[in-house]
A protein has these predicted regions:
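Hydrophobic transmembrane alpha-helices and their helix-loop junctions in integral membrane proteins
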Residues: 1-109, 119-122, 138-140
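Re-entrant/interfacial helical elements at transmembrane boundaries that shape
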Residues: 16-19, 111-120, 152, 190-197
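Active-site proximal loops enriched in glycine and acidic residues that flank catalytic Cys/His/Asp
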Residues: 18-19, 52-54, 133, 145, ...
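Hydrophobic, aromatic-rich alpha-helical transmembrane segments
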Residues: 44-48, 52, 127, 131, ...
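Predominantly late transmembrane helices and immediately cytosolic-facing juxtamembrane segments
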Residues: 56-65, 69, 74, 128-163
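Cytoplasmic/organellar membrane-interface segments at the starts of transmembrane helices
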Residues: 71, 78-93, 145-204
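Transmembrane helix interruption/hinge and helix-loop junction motifs
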Residues: 123-127, 185-187
Length: 204
């Protein structure tokens, strides 16, 4: 999924293919549990559940942003997103948070869920799975950062006057999703603990 995402020219298609990669991260947890590392079962499955939860907020927010851009009629490619940050700074800042968190950069929620997943895989003897996950996660930074680069660093290629009229519901939803994604960072400890408790109940 990550390799296909890296070749896309449309932002929505990139996100769709990257979803396959995130499903693969969760499967790393399943593989570790299947290996029979009972001492780590709850931790690894808890991390997988936490990653899916964090991913849900990040990805939902990103698709809401795309829906808003399509409402404006700007376009679908990375080039079409150029300069949007100047006309819609708050929503574009939220989109940057989604992209960096999806890429798993440190200090973002996506990093911690991946870290616990990869560590659990290593403890279960699947070091090669953790290595593959780390490499594909690094690759994802390339295509996620393309969105941020277009929004904030590139000159507009078309008329962005349509952005002066903001769809209130979509705009607010994007910003709220961005705030929740940021708040997941200090709240990640309780999130992972709750997920581990739920996983432990399954294996009890």
């Amino acid at each position: 999924g990550n390799f296909a995402a890296a070749t896309q020219s449309e932002v929505k298609r990139m996100l769709a293919y990257s979803s396959i990669g995130h499903a693969g991260y969760a499967l790393i947890g399943l593989a570790a549990v299947t290996a029979g590392a009972s001492a780590n079962n709850a931790t690894v499955m808890g991390a997988a559940m936490a990653h899916l939860l964090v991913y849900g907020f990040m990805n939902t927010g990103a698709f809401l942003f795309i829906a808003m851009v399509e409402h404006w009629g700007v376009g679908r490619t990375f080039e079409d997103y150029a300069g949007i940050g100047r006309k819609a700074p708050m929503a574009s800042m939220a989109m940057a948070v989604f992209m960096f968190s999806l890429a798993g950069l440190p200090l973002f929620g996506g990093f911690f869920s991946k870290y616990v997943l990869f560590l659990g895989a290593i403890n279960a003897g699947f070091w090669w799975l953790a290595a593959v996950g780390a490499v594909t996660s690094a690759l994802s930074l390339y295509y996620y950062s393309r969105v941020v680069k277009a929004l904030w660093l590139e000159e507009p290629t078309g008329n962005l006057d349509a952005l002066d009229s903001k769809p209130t519901g979509l705009y607010a939803a994007v910003i709220v999703a961005g705030v929740i994604t940021v708040l997941l960072l200090p709240g990640f400890g309780p999130v992972i603990e709750t997920a581990e408790a739920a996983a432990a109940a399954v294996f009890a």
